[in-house]
Amino acid sequence: MRWIAFAWFALWFPMYWRTWGAANFVHLCDVAVILTSIGIWTNSSLLISSQAVGAFVVDVAWAADATSRIVLGHALFPGNEYLTNPHYPLWIRSLTIFHLVMPALLLWGVYRMGYNRRGYALQCAIALLVFIVARFTQPSANIDFAFSDPFFHRAWGPAPAHVLLTWLFMVVLVYAPTHLLLKRFFRGPEATAV
């Protein structure tokens, strides 16, 4: 699996950089690809666990939205408009298939390496840093919804307040429940050591 992760990263990273630019790597889902690849390569239960906390629910939601967009012609959530935009070549849009693979890959990684409970805290720290960095990207891109939320399309106060509220939304409503489920259903890394 290490070599598959390495090969995917070697293909995906330069093509994404060329097509979308460096700012695209501020997206939490792209950060997840990078950290998951490193986690698989280094056999790090901490990195895999943090990305299981951070990416599992988001990628499942992405898959539901992509399916709705492609099959039914309407979106469930904002952010996947590029999927049906013919301006971008189909092959580059198809590289986003990682969203479909990531949930299973992360669960496999947690099963194999164990769920490191520190992954929750690490993912909370990663997300805060990423949300802050996203504020320095183009407001029109609204990367990680750092400028306006995806539901009401508004900013929740000045930049620091909006970033904090966006981060708290993810920490409390996405990461914490995922952490509790992973903690409940998977052994710790010490129990999986051979």
Whereabouts are the PLM-identified features?
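Hydrophobic/aromatic-rich structural module bridging two neighboring secondary-structure elements via a short loop
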Residues: 28, 33-79
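Hydrophobic cores of alpha-helical transmembrane segments in multi-pass inner/ER membrane proteins
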Residues: 32-41, 94-110, 166-181
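Membrane-proximal helix-loop-helix units in multi-pass membrane proteins
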Residues: 61-126
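Membrane-interface transmembrane-helix boundary segments in multi-pass integral membrane proteins
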Residues: 137-175
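Short, hydrophobic transmembrane alpha-helix segments
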Residues: 13-22
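Central hydrophobic cores of alpha-helical transmembrane segments
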Residues: 50-58, 119-130
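Alpha-helical transmembrane segments
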Residues: 1-12
